[in-house]
């Protein structure tokens, strides 16, 4: 069946990961190693939708501190805000954000911005599946988004994606995203617990520095520019807005690296 592949032992060794590390509850894999692990799993199991179905059954509590923080939030809107705000402590070389479209629909966008990670399809599919289940934790197992977007080309077994998300799925898009109506944001989370939320946030902040800090501002500026290039060369103000810093801060960081805006 579709979920049978989930119980197959993942090929840690082939992905460059020591098997005895697999059970460590606070294990933090480099994003490149994580992506290799799931691409290799899909290859060895000959199940091209491995990441899709892995993410589909991955519950928010399986996300560790990050997941517990989200489901402890008072409303779904604050749960998604918690996910995006704490993402920098969970994973580097990537972004997670929620933006409102002109038509009022919301986009929960996820993308890896490290150019050296080329094979990233499995990661994208399992990640959106995880985020879907955070929303379903609040709205119920039958809730579905309006649309789902993936940046990779349409695979052969693409109808599985529409079954997994119960929604139209579009491929070769600018980013990976769940598109949904905003009227669900005020719904209360069933496991809301402000005290637990505070503890989880504090633990994540103390366990390690923000991955954005680890990536370095200069690297984040370059990644933000690359991300916008398909839509034309971005302005300094656009990049500053994306990074939530002032245009002057962007210019100072470039100057510190003896680079101009166009060099970056």
What would you call each of these model-derived segments?
Residues 14-15, 151, 242:
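Short acidic/histidine-centered micro-motifs embedded in hydrophobic/aromatic stretches
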Residues 155, 163-264:
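Extended mid-to-C-terminal alpha-helical interaction segments
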Residues 1-109:
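N-terminal low-complexity or simple alpha-helical regulatory segments
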Residues 3-7, 18, 48, 141-144, ...:
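Short coil/loop linkers at secondary-structure junctions
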Residues 79, 127-130, 196:
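Internal, well-ordered alpha-helical segments in soluble enzyme and binding-protein domains
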Residues 95, 99-185:
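DNA-contacting interfaces and partner/effector-binding or oligomerization modules
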Residues 64-70, 113-117, 185-186, 206-207:
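Short hinge/gating elements
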């Amino acid at each position: 069946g579709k979920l049978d592949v989930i119980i197959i032992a993942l090929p840690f060794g082939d992905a460059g990961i020591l098997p005895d590390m697999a059970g460590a509850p606070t294990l933090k894999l480099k994003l490149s190693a994580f992506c290799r692990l799931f691409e290799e799993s899909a290859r060895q199991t000959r199940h091209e939708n491995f990441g899709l179905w892995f993410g589909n059954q991955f519950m928010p509590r399986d996300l560790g501190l990050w997941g517990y923080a989200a489901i402890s939030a008072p409303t779904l809107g604050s749960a998604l805000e918690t996910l995006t705000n704490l993402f920098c402590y969970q994973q580097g070389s990537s972004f997670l954000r929620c933006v409102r479209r002109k038509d009022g629909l919301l986009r929960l966008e996820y993308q890896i911005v490290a150019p050296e990670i080329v094979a990233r399809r499995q990661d994208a599919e399992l990640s959106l599946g995880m985020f879907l289940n955070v929303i379903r934790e609040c709205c119920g197992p039958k809730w579905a988004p309006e649309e789902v977007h993936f940046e990779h080309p349409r695979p052969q077994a693409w109808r599985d994606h529409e079954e997994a998300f119960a929604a139209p799925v579009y491929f070769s898009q600018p980013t990976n995203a769940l598109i949904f109506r905003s009227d669900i944001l005020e719904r209360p989370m069933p496991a809301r617990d402000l005290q637990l939320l505070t503890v989880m946030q504090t633990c994540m902040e103390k366990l390690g520095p923000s991955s954005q800090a680890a990536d370095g501002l200069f690297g984040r500026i370059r990644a933000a520019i690359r991300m916008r290039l398909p839509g034309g060369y971005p302005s300094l103000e656009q990049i500053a807005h994306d990074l939530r810093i002032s245009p002057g801060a962007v210019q100072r960081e470039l100057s510190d690296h003896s680079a101009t805006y166009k060099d970056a």
